[in-house]
Amino acid sequence: MATEHPEPPKAELQLPPPPPPGHYGAWAAQELQAKLAEIGAPIQGNREELVERLQSYTRQTGIVLNRPVLRGEDGDKAAPPPMSAQLPGIPMPPPPLGLPPLQPPPPPPPPPPGLGLGFPMAHPPNLGPPPPLRVGEPVALSEEERLKLAQQQAALLMQQEERAKQQGDHSLKEHELLEQQKRAAVLLEQERQQEIAKMGTPVPRPPQDMGQIGVRTPLGPRVAAPVGPVGPTPTVLPMGAPVPRPRGPPPPPGDENREMDDPSVGPKIPQALEKILQLKESRQEEMNSQQEEEEMETDARSSLGQSASETEEDTVSVSKKEKNRKRRNRKKKKKPQRVRGVSSESSGDREKDSTRSRGSDSPAADVEIEYVTEEPEIYEPNFIFFKRIFEAFKLTDDVKKEKEKEPEKLDKLENSAAPKKKGFEEEHKDSDDDSSDDEQEKKPEAPKLSKKKLRRMNRFTVAELKQLVARPDVVEMHDVTAQDPKLLVHLKATRNSVPVPRHWCFKRKYLQGKRGIEKPPFELPDFIKRTGIQEMREALQEKEEQKTMKSKMREKVRPKMGKIDIDYQKLHDAFFKWQTKPKLTIHGDLYYEGKEFETRLKEKKPGDLSDELRISLGMPVGPNAHKVPPPWLIAMQRYGPPPSYPNLKIPGLNSPIPESCSFGYHAGGWGKPPVDETGKPLYGDVFGTNAAEFQTKTEEEEIDRTPWGELEPSDEESSEEEEEEESDEDKPDETGFITPADSGLITPGGFSSVPAGMETPELIELRKKKIEEAMDGSETPQLFTVLPEKRTATVGGAMMGSTHIYDMSTVMSRKGPAPELQGVEVALAPEELELDPMAMTQKYEEHVREQQAQVEKEDFSDMVAEHAAKQKQKKRKAQPQDSRGGSKKYKEFKF
């Protein structure tokens, strides 16, 4: 606990930083348990667990706990003064296994927090002094040191009171505080007397360690540097002053007191090394003294500045504090509270001092630190690509947050005249109900933008995205939420890309929507209905419903097959004659829920009335349905044809009415034809006169053939270019540079160079010419020809006779026009081409006679013999198989 001291000057109250949580290891087990009980933590467990609990409490709250004062048996006596090993500046000795200090390495880094102040390595303090390093330094504490010590004690006391208030710990009563302060004062007095008594005797450490207070760097392996102000108080550790220990492994917990009895003596240092160390220490002291003088000057300046700023801030802050106090008091009256002690004035003064000390920190609190990354100067050409990769991952959200918060900061500064304090109280602001309520009454908290809101702010709108992309018609409302909206639209616009199914963003499950659509039961296609399977199944189901349970079970054991037998001819006709193609969608046109119920406008044509529409309008359906006028005809005759379809032929309006129909307003009448005063039709040829006016009019009117309502495919241009190239090839040459093939073969005029008898006859067609024509393939040959079937009742005397005979006459007639009578097809040698036509006809007749004679001579005896031989061979092969198969008896398999 803190000790009682006269209050130091207010301007110089500066809280030292808290010590690390490692100093709890030096406490005894009883002290650890007492402190844990004080903070309301469990006290069971071994020593290491107790230390760990205290350390975790310090880390979480930021409060450094001081060593408790254990009471004696009578309850009021203070605990005995601590041993010399626990005094500040005289740390625990290390275990005997220390680093040998003979060869000094380069100055090590400052020791870790929690280690003791500088003693010779591996030299216990109870076994006499080490070789002397320096002689003759003033031992008595100066006025400045005492003043600083008193300031530290007062600051600790005030800080402890503040913490007790903020944590709502009102259980400590005022008389207990006074008793603790008295005990602390007694302890401090005893420690001072011990310190002075020891300074008179030889001390087991170099005397400069008790000298001037300052920051010292480590001087090698022998002497560790003290960090922070060295105070003479053993129980109260100044906040933030880490106590360095000599190097080496720390002693196990609970063995600190045993080290005092360790009889091992450290190794002695040679004189040459001692002189070197003394020179180093003297240089270090000079440096430290200069630094201390500079620090004193800066402290004096800052204290003057702070006192000036405090006077201005006090006037503003006092009125606010009074209001806050009144509010808090009102709330405290409502809550059940315990009666506080008498010393309210002293606590009020302390509050003022603490607020002033906090106010002095305000100029430092306003400073904002900005971290700027240093960009390396690398002139490697490949470094640019490497740098671009990292630039892609830079976060821009933080910059936007700062920009948005700038106007909010200005509002905060205007609302709060006194700047807010940062530090301990700001961390616990949320826990303090009073202060948080007051702030909520003053002003609403500035809203912090979440990542979701930031993402929404950075999104494109649908209109912006449509402007940025090449195909805006593909953009949908949810495309802006994609990670890369431009890439998504590009992928959607790519040719032959299949879209993601629409139900990806639906809440309900796929095909589970029933939004007012009456789904009809499944209907069989018409070509399957014609087989009559539907009626047969319905009849069978009715029979099964009438059956008893017994007969049903009997059928399960011995099922009867062939209940629904359809004639094979019916099935054949259904699937080969009447089958229709199912409705298929094109590539990339995915099915979505309710697609089959949508109207397909592509199938509809203006002017053609479907059967459904006719039935709904009350018009007749059938072959003579076109003779009944539509109900809108009379309105069209009055107001004109529809402007969207100017060239649509509507009977009774701009085209003649059907035959055996008449104009008039009777049932089935076609109204009145639209004519002008002179009797001429207004909109078209209503009377069917086919006058020249209407024909020329229709010719003059150019119809726009460009497609509308659907985008043209992107590959249309390429196909058009190919068609143009093909058409160019087909056109005859108009330039006149290419000579046609026929022109050189015909002699333009004059006499023939070949005599009359030597001309090639026109009647002969060579086989070569036929083959060439077939090779050219100018006409696509027919794949097959259906032969008509002839039926004969009797086979007759023919050996291979059949009732089915095919009529070949139609095929022969289709082959082409009959050859001319004079033309003869004969295979001729080149020498025989010189013969006259009479000789050739004679040769042909001889050839025909020879063929007829061969046909008459031919008989079928050889074919009959072959057939009989084959039959015998089959019988021979079948006999041994039957003999083998007779040995085994197999059950006859039935379908």
Swiss-Prot record:
Phosphothreonine carried by residues: T298, T311, T780
Compositional bias ranges of the Low complexity kind: 218-238
Coiled-coil segments on the chain, per record: 140-199
Organism of this sequence: Homo sapiens (Human)
Region Disordered, annotated ranges: 1-24, 65-136, 197-373, 400-453, 691-757, 844-895
Record-given protein name: Splicing factor 3B subunit 2
Biological classification of the source: Eukaryota, Metazoa, Chordata, Craniata, Vertebrata
Disorder association: Craniofacial microsomia 1: A form of craniofacial microsomia, a disorder characterized by a spectrum of craniofacial malformations ranging from isolated microtia with or without aural atresia to underdevelopment of the mandible, maxilla, orbit, facial soft tissue, and/or facial nerve. CFM1 is an autosomal dominant form characterized by mandibular hypoplasia, microtia, facial and preauricular skin tags, epibulbar dermoids, and lateral oral clefts. Affected individuals also present skeletal and cardiac abnormalities.
Biased composition (Pro residues): 90-114, 122-133, 241-254
Effect of K509R: Moderately diminished formation of omega-N monomethylarginine but greatly reduced formation of symmetrical dimethylarginine. Abolishes formation of omega-N monomethylarginine and formation of symmetrical dimethylarginine
Impact after mutating R508K: Abolishes interaction with SMN1; Abolishes methylation by PRMT9. Abolishes formation of omega-N monomethylarginine and formation of symmetrical dimethylarginine
Any one GO molecular-function label of the UniProt entry: RNA binding
Reported effect, R530K: Does not affect methylation by PRMT9
Sequence ranges assigned to domain SAP in this UniProt record: 24-58
Pfam families, per database record: DUF382, PSP, SAP
Chain spans, region Required for interaction with PRMT9: 401-550
Highest rank taxon of the organism: Eukaryota
Modified residues (Phosphoserine): S289, S307, S309, S317, S360, S362, S431, S435, S436, S861
